[in-house]
């Protein structure tokens, strides 16, 4: 009988085309060889895992629990000896009883399944074990088993990361919009709101005015372009707002000079965009003697039930007004904003630089614009949202009082502007062209803004220094009090030469009192005996 070995006679016959390679008996033999290979893989992994467990030191950094060792023991016995056929140990062997229970609980599990379970339990604790030669050998035999974990969680992790990235990007966009545009007042359905509310104020405006048409994609692009140049949402004031100049510097309107409707293409594009979004554009021409307002989408008077109420959300606004008061008190360009006369007409007093356009040449053709969100009317003495939120008082000048109210709703502000003598008056325009000349327009608005920031920074530094001074004084007082307490502590009665912690009197009492007690007991028994006798 010839004995054929794999890879010798059969392979030679297949190469010589004597025996076809796809015969049924050949395929069955290949299947048996593959099963043997798979069995050998499980066995090699099992043997490597057993070596790792056996090589663990008794006092090493990794100490498996008793339950874990019982699992490994039961799987090892099942993989090597098969199902448990031994009798249960007696009560005097509790460890043997625990082992027998763990082994018999596996039932009729096959050896291959026990090997696989042993290796799977090893994978759970493989990361916590120290890296040794046996562990490296086991890792080499097992292979990259972490791919399964990554494949299971890859879809969820990608979804979570995408959602988080979207939320973060949205928050960053909202924060950028808030930082790019300072709080500017705008009116929606006769109520004034500020533009620092971001997305929520837009949603509120949409709820209050549902009939307003939604802007198209082209309109949105135009609004983004106009917002890049500067925010157009400002309100014309008569000079009584302290913060209007600083906010107007950041929101100045860059337009070209025009007279009787002659504007450049830039202004026309902005006007068309504002017509689509339902905004009110107010143009002030200095060559017109009568007060008028060119309103595109209608005029609506500002009314509110809480005109006399004043609200403030934070103390930061009071600090901003105090810094502005100190800055305006000096002789500078800010003196114009508080030195005006309330009885003086708006057109003759001139407008602050917050609503000036491009610096002109002093001619009366310079055009000023004020854009107000929605339908509204800009009154004399109108204040913007960022300046009135921190003013809990009424200003009365020359018999004329102004009531301010700023109500926080969501993240936006509401305010109502009232003036007793001129509630029905609108923003007019005068012919005083000197106020609109290049002298005031050419002043660097950036210098004033930097000066204001420096003043606020200086105030913050002063506050920090005051706090540090208070902390130093508190620490010094605590040190003095602790020193006084230590000096006032009573001195111990024991002398310096005494070696024990107890005082000499306490030590002598502790030694003598047993003898005294014994003597008293002895006296008691003596008297008792005498009485009995």
Swiss-Prot record:
Highly expressed in brain and liver. Lower levels of expression in spleen and heart. It is found in: Peroxisome membrane. It comes from the Eukaryota. The modification Phosphoserine is found at residues 194-195, 197, 201, 244, 314, 429. One of its GO terms (molecular function) is fatty-acyl-CoA binding. Residues 42-131 form the ACB domain. Residues 448-478 form a coiled coil. It is a single-pass membrane protein. Pfam families: ACBP (PF00887). Keywords: Acetylation, Autophagy, Coiled coil, Lipid-binding, Membrane, Peroxisome, Phosphoprotein, Transmembrane, Transmembrane helix, Transport. The chain crosses the membrane at residues 503-525. The modification N6-acetyllysine is found at residue 470. The keyword Protein biosynthesis does not apply. The keyword Transmembrane helix applies. GO terms for cellular component: cytoplasm; peroxisomal membrane; peroxisome. An acyl-CoA binds at residues 53-62, 73-77, 99, 118. Residues 182-227, 339-443 are annotated as: Disordered. Residues 208-227, 374-383, 432-442 have a biased composition (Basic and acidic residues). One of its GO terms (biological process) is pexophagy. SUPFAM superfamilies: Acyl-CoA binding protein (SSF47027). Acyl-CoA binding protein which acts as the peroxisome receptor for pexophagy but is dispensable for aggrephagy and nonselective autophagy. Binds medium- and long-chain acyl-CoA esters. Belongs to the ATG37 family. This is Acyl-CoA-binding domain-containing protein 5. It comes from Bos taurus (Bovine).
